[in-house]
Amino acid sequence: MFRTAVMMAASLALTGAVVAHAYYLKHQFYPTVVYLTKSSPSMAVLYIQAFVLVFLLGKVMGKVFFGQLRAAEMEHLLERSWYAVTETCLAFTVFRDDFSPRFVALFTLLLFLKCFHWLAEDRVDFMERSPNISWLFHCRIVSLMFLLGILDFLFVSHAYHSILTRGASVQLVFGFEYAILMTMVLTIFIKYVLHSVDLQSENPWDNKAVYMLYTELFTGFIKVLLYMAFMTIMIKVHTFPLFAIRPMYLAMRQFKKAVTDAIMSRRAIRNMNTLYPDATPEELQAMDNVCIICREEMVTGAKRLPCNHIFHTSCLRSWFQRQQTCPTCRMDVLRASLPAQSPPPPEPADQGPPPAPHPPPLLPQPPNFPQGLLPPFPPGMFPLWPPMGPFPPVPPPPSSGEAVAPPSTSAAALSRPSGAATTTAAGTSATAASATASGPGSGSAPEAGPAPGFPFPPPWMGMPLPPPFAFPPMPVPPAGFAGLTPEELRALEGHERQHLEARLQSLRNIHTLLDAAMLQINQYLTVLASLGPPRPATSVNSTEETATTVVAAASSTSIPSSEATTPTPGASPPAPEMERPPAPESVGTEEMPEDGEPDAAELRRRRLQKLESPVAH
């Protein structure tokens, strides 16, 4: 207040000094006025004095029509005033040819009236939050709206007649500006009427938010039309109105928001009426039955949102007109709402009792696998690998002090079985061979068997895999829903809390299956990376001896499996001459596998033949 008084006194002193100086030079009234209008410093001082007078007039009118302004109203006024002053300066650059004291006075008057329109809008919006409205408040607002409406209409009429008589000029800008201010006065008046009707009723008016929403939609559409017409005319007649870009953008954004709010509110209210269940008395008693929107107790007519918060139906309807979220947790009710269930088609009256619904399919029980085996991989994970059984351990190569078993016996013990009985026999033979190799007197440690939980080695590796670590079992894949009827699927879908929890649990199960599959793959790759390349076979004899050994090993596979005997524990004497394999020329060639490469068992048998060849010769 003190700064305002100092500024007013300084402006008044400067104005008096300038006028006295001009009169001292000219000594007459008319020459003094001419001198003041032609002198730029004198005009600057007079402009400052005019602004001070306008400021004082605004203070007086504010006291008359508003009384004491609130802090929020002053903040909004200053924020909008800065933008208005910037737009006015841009308008001065567009109409620099028409720049004159009259032009400045018209823009100052326009800014002055805009300030009162903004204050009237804020004060009417305050009616909704104020519990007590006095008659003085009504008299002030009604008289202010009446005065602003008359002034806006007069300035629009003046601009219209000026354009008709003098052509397109700066009055085109003022005409459209005052027309937009008239739409603002119309919006303020409708809101005032709605708030007044709501204050007169004891209970809250449910339809007030609907009328306010459609009022903003209607007035926003009018503003958009006015700005589009103004931009089109200004571009054709004068130039591009740069100062009108920001208010036009704000008007279009406000109109778009009004349209979106109207659509979303209708959708939210429709969902509330169709999807949200009514709150039962038990639910109201089990929780705090005070509606946080109106702060009144809920007895009847309450709705429960998908987030399990309960409110009055009328309060929710008014709330959804403004925003489509839960008043408590801010959950988007449009995204959380599920589509309504389609009612089942009516059944004919002459039909018998409906058949019993099919029971939901039970999840398959996990099969029992032998110790150290994994369940098979899900179908489609490794399509090129056929299912394989447990791979038998390989007996270690005999040391120098131990006897060498006949090739036919080793081949029969290491050959892959084809049936269950053969599998048992082969496993027993391999176990006996391992026990013989690791018995007392052996000079080498036993080789590691297959990895527990990993039933097969890589197809290109000849040595058994070391046990890396224990693998967790593969989870059982979930069952499908192909056998369910549409009615059962609708019943399983559901819209309650337990159905949502079931869906979340299914997603967690899928996540667990994916994690288990990736874990198995990573463990398999880790085992492969930890193993080195296969050791090359040592060349003991010449090329002729190697070929003879290979043919002899091939002939040993033609001996029936019934003639194969299991070696006994302990060291055995060298094989006699009659037990040696037949000559190579009397043996046919062995059939190779389909892929043209010998398998792991064949490679191991050949190595045993190479180690045995010095003893044979």
Swiss-Prot record:
The gene is SYVN1. It is linked to In certain aggressive cases of activated B cell-like diffuse large B-cell lymphoma (ABC-DLBCL), plays a role in the degradation of misfolded N-terminal mutated PRDM1 proteins. Not N-glycosylated. Auto-ubiquitinated. Deubiquitinated by USP19. It comes from Homo sapiens. This is E3 ubiquitin-protein ligase synoviolin. The lineage of its organism: Eukaryota, Metazoa, Chordata, Craniata, Vertebrata. The keyword Acyltransferase does not apply. Residues 26-41, 120-140, 191-224 are lumenal. Residues 480-535 are annotated as: HAF-H domain. Residues 1-251 are annotated as: Involved in FAM8A1 interaction. GO terms for cellular component: Derlin-1 retrotranslocation complex; endomembrane system; endoplasmic reticulum; endoplasmic reticulum membrane; endoplasmic reticulum quality control compartment; Hrd1p ubiquitin ligase complex; Hrd1p ubiquitin ligase ERAD-L complex; membrane. Homodimer. Interacts with p53/TP53. Interacts with HTT. Component of the HRD1 complex, which comprises at least SYNV1/HRD1, DERL1/2, FAM8A1, HERPUD1/HERP, OS9, SEL1L and UBE2J1. FAM8A1 is stabilized by interaction with SYNV1, which prevents its proteasomal degradation. OS9 and UBE2J1 recruitment to the complex may be mediated by SEL1L. SYNV1 assembles with SEL1L and FAM8A1 through its transmembrane domains, but interaction with its cytoplasmic domain is required to confer stability to FAM8A1 and enhance recruitment of HERPUD1. InterPro entries: HRD1_E3_ubiq-ligases (IPR050731), Znf_RING (IPR001841), Znf_RING/FYVE/PHD (IPR013083). Residues 1-4, 63-98, 162-169, 246-617 are cytoplasmic. It is a multi-pass membrane protein. E3 ubiquitin-protein ligase which accepts ubiquitin specifically from endoplasmic reticulum-associated UBC7 E2 ligase and transfers it to substrates, promoting their degradation. Component of the endoplasmic reticulum quality control (ERQC) system also called ER-associated degradation (ERAD) involved in ubiquitin-dependent degradation of misfolded endoplasmic reticulum proteins. Also promotes the degradation of normal but naturally short-lived proteins such as SGK. Protects cells from ER stress-induced apoptosis.
